[in-house]
């Protein structure tokens, strides 16, 4: 007798279709009931951005957890209309946020863009690699800087992450442009500035934000 399956699993490889790319298949596995998305580089579903795109296509962008299995992944952008999102990495999950060969094509900070309200990055190794020396190409490994619009309504929390560059004098480990922020128990190395705070069109509260328990080395400024 077959058991009734209560969970709804969707294996996604394109924005709105169940089709696979030629060669390596990219995508994510979504559990709509638990609001959990899984990116796994080893089984071919290794695209974090595709997981985010699939959540966006589902329509409900609030309260998701994106679990990153062990492996190497590309940088990603969480849109401004996402809320209460956690991106959590397993041991040996590495996000390579910078590729010097495409630096000229960047229109953002060049790393992970975590826009939205109450976004949490947890347990990730974020590798900026060999950041090019030219200014204006790459500015931060993690950022929620949103240009002239500013980060009003944004909040970003970075916990238990390792963020490393290669002795860059032109980039930040984390660039905050929001009234809500936390950096806890992270290791940051190899940047001009470990953590930078920007302020576009908002006031940062005197309480409620915290930078604590972090280790900073090989940076010009903490």
Give residue spans per PLM region:
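Sec-dependent signal peptide cleavage junction
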Residues: 21-31
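Extracellular beta-strand-rich solenoid/capping regions of secreted or surface-exposed proteins
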Residues: 49, 53-58, 74-88, 95-154, ...
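Bacterial N-terminal signal peptides
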Residues: 12-20
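Bacterial Sec-dependent N-terminal signal peptides
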Residues: 1-12
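Right-handed parallel beta-helix
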Residues: 120-221
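Acidic Gly/Asp/Thr-rich repetitive segments characteristic of extracellular carbohydrate-active
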Residues: 29-67
């Amino acid at each position: 007798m077959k058991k009734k399956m209560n969970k709804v699993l969707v294996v996604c490889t394109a924005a709105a279709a169940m089709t696979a790319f030629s060669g390596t298949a990219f995508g994510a596995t979504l559990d709509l009931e638990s609001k959990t998305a899984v990116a796994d580089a080893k089984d071919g579903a290794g695209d974090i951005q595709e997981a985010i795109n699939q959540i966006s296509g589902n329509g409900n962008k609030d309260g998701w957890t994106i679990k990153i299995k062990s492996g190497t992944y590309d940088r990603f952008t969480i849109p401004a209309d996402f809320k209460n999102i956690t991106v959590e990495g397993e041991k040996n999950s590495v996000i390579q946020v910078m590729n010097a060969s495409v630096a000229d094509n960047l229109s953002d900070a060049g790393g992970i863009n975590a826009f939205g309200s109450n976004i949490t990055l947890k347990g990730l190794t974020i590798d900026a690699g060999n950041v090019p020396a030219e200014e204006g190409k790459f500015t931060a490994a993690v950022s929620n800087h949103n240009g002239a619009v500013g980060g009003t309504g944004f909040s970003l929390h970075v916990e238990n992450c390792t963020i490393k560059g290669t002795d860059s004098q032109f980039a930040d480990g984390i660039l905050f442009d929001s009234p809500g922020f936390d950096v806890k128990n992270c290791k940051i190395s190899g940047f001009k500035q470990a953590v930078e705070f920007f302020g576009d069109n908002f006031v940062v509260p005197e309480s409620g934000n915290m930078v604590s328990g972090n280790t900073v080395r090989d940076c010009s400024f903490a």
